[in-house]
């Protein structure tokens, strides 16, 4: 009978290299990317008005406020409108009480305007917002514009 052939294993003379340095390199690159994102967020927070529209509120009477938005170059009429609507939906709770508001467009301001100076000029939109307990005042302030109810 024939004998089974023996299994021959050869050991490599070179030892496997430790992977710890690769781990440190990957961790360092990851931390560097996180730091870059956080630095960008910090830089834009300081110059927030330059990138976004800031809502400005002026109380009228009761729950009624006059609301408009100002900002830097990216705050054109579209940005002002979005900021006003976002502020209305976040600040007022229609489940507590119904809400009345109107948004009045200023036709003197062009749709795309870049207010880069300290004097931002007139706002493109102005809104009057209030709960229905003050609906008479909202109707008076809105005059001929459409009044929305939520």
UniProtKB/Swiss-Prot annotation:
Reported impact of residue 41 to Y: Partially impairs LAC1-LIP1 complex formation
Impact noted for substituting residue 74 to F: Does not affect LAC1-LIP1 complex formation but abolishes enzymatic activity
Effect ascribed to mutating residue 142 to A: About 90% loss in enzymatic activity of the LAC1-LIP1 complex
Outcome (variant: residue 148 to A): About 95% loss in enzymatic activity of the LAC1-LIP1 complex
Family: Belongs to the LIP1 family.
Outcome following mutation: residue 53 to A: About 90% loss in enzymatic activity of the LAC1-LIP1 complex
Protein name (database record): Ceramide synthase subunit LIP1
């Amino acid at each position: 009978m024939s004998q089974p052939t023996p299994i021959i294993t050869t050991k490599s003379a070179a030892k496997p290299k430790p992977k710890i340095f690769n781990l440190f390199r990957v961790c360092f690159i990851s931390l560097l990317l996180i730091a870059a994102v956080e630095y960008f967020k910090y830089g834009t927070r300081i110059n927030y008005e330059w990138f976004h529209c800031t809502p400005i509120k002026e109380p009228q009477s009761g729950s009624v406020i006059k609301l408009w938005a100002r900002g830097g170059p990216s705050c054109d009429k579209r940005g002002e409108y979005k900021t006003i609507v976002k502020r209305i939906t976040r600040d007022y709770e229609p489940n507590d009480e119904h809400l009345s508001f109107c948004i009045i467009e200023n036709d003197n301001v062009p749709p795309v305007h870049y207010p880069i100076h300290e004097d931002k000029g007139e706002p493109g939109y102005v809104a009057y917002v209030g709960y229905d307990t003050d609906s008479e005042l909202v109707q008076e302030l809105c005059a001929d514009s459409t009044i929305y109810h939520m």
